[in-house]
Amino acid sequence: MTFASLRRGYQVIRTLLHYGLDDVLPPTLLPGYFKLLRLCLFWVRNRHKDKCGGERLKLAMQELGPVYIKFGQMLSTRRDLLSDEWAQELSMLQDRVPAFDSALAREAIEAELKAPIDSLFDDFDDTPLASASISQVHTATLKSNGQQVVLKVLRPNVEANIKADLELMLQVATWVNRLLGEGNRLRPVEVVEDYQNTILGELNLKLEALNATKLRNNFLDSDALYIPYVYEELCHPRLMVMERIDGIPVSDIEALNAQGTNLKLLAERGVELFFTQVFRDNFFHADMHPGNIFISREHPENPFYIGLDCGIMGSLNEEDKRYLAENFLAFFNRDYHRIAQLYVESGWVSADTDILAFEQAVKLVCEPMFNKPLNEISFGHVLLELFRTARRFDIVVQPQLVLLEKTLLYIEGLGRQLYPQLDLWQTAKPFLERWMAEQVGPKAIFKKVQTNLPFWSDKLPEFPELIYDNLKLGRKLLGSQQQMLDRYLKYQQKAHKSNFLLITSAVLLICGTILFAQTDTLWLASACLGSGALVWGAGWRSRPKNRKF
């Protein structure tokens, strides 16, 4: 490790100790002299004993800076790992940092564009529109078409700083994994690696631009979602240029009510958008917190969402999508045996899992939820509780499913904030049933046949030759297998005969040795020893020489 890494490591440990996070560890894991060591090496006392563990961790991450703040935000969505109290505290972390010098922003933008800002843009505003831990946003006007745009540029040295902190996080996670028995259940290394993949993806603004364009194309004809146009020719790994939008933050309910927005329709459209992204497009926005979502000012009676920040996107494979849809349908049909079967069939839990025990565990979690009205049941919490239950059966929650569960919780929270009476099931059920029918019904089978028709048409002329070759090969294999079986049987016969003779000779030799000690039976001892030697020789000669079949 470099000196800089050691210094940062010391700073991280000192901050964690300052907030007394060593208190949350089991006392048996820390040596008796640990408190003295803490005072001597780090000069800190725990002055936060009056605060709960979750609040202490939140304060520590705020002090450690942007990388740890975003890590805390990610942890707040892992309610399959953390208690509700800890997750709730971490969810209050805010990714807000002071803006960096606009001169540095100009320098970074011009380095990416390889051209002066004034040659491409008018009215570049040196005062940032927004500033976050990874990037900063400035406004300008495109010279080519007069369109108002925003320029999102990475902070100076952000990549090096993030990678250094990630390396340290992985080392700490590895240590925790070894130290704690609980560490195996929490899987700290897996959690940090998941976060690493997420945040490193956010460092590539060119990738974010491609994600935004793909999502925009998926909803070009939609009256429910609008994604701002991205100027891909001006986008680079450290710079993204996109259309500037004017909308109302989704969390500003007062402003939405003031313009007469149809909140019921808006809430229902949010649910439909989620299921459309997941099941129709298999490409969903996985960071749909209120700061990334705005509502159109036009047509408040027919409102649409405006989505920003496509740095984190998710997708599921076809099987996971089907299992997920069946899971939801089975839950609302109260078919807990089917839910347990689906978890095993999907590979989310081990095939040797006790289905009946798992079914009972699922029933204990799900059945109390039906005491609530349907419009109070949360899909996200259903999925979350199923993950928590399955974790007791050694489930490894896939990162994409965690992203989906987090997104579903966001969507539900927003929907019920907009319209508290939102009946999620009433909105989602027709969509899920229609999607399932499309996947397994006659139309789906015909579509799959139609899709694969060119391939099979190309292969059809080869079928007679393939059948003949396979029959010929099968005949050869059958003959060779019969020969191998014959050789194996002969080998076994020889081996049994040899073993029998060798065991018999051993018995004769032992008996001869015992009899030899008695002077009145020397003749019998000699006979046993001689016979034993002869039988041993016969057994040795008859043993099989070749084990190859």
From Swiss-Prot:
Which sites bind ATP? 129-137, 152
Which InterPro entries does UniProt cross-reference here? ABC1_dom (IPR004147), Kinase-like_dom_sf (IPR011009), UbiB (IPR010232), UbiB_bact (IPR045308), UbiB_kinase (IPR050154)
Enzyme Commission code(s) on record: 2.7.-.-
Protein topology in the membrane? Multi-pass membrane protein
Q: Where is the active site?
A: 287 (proton acceptor)
Q: Which residues form a coiled coil?
A: none
Does the keyword section mention Nucleus? Answer: no
State any GO BP term from the record.
regulation of ubiquinone biosynthetic process
Q: Which family does it belong to?
A: Belongs to the ABC1 family. UbiB subfamily.
What does this gene product do? Is probably a protein kinase regulator of UbiI activity which is involved in aerobic coenzyme Q (ubiquinone) biosynthesis.
Protein name (database record)? Probable protein kinase UbiB
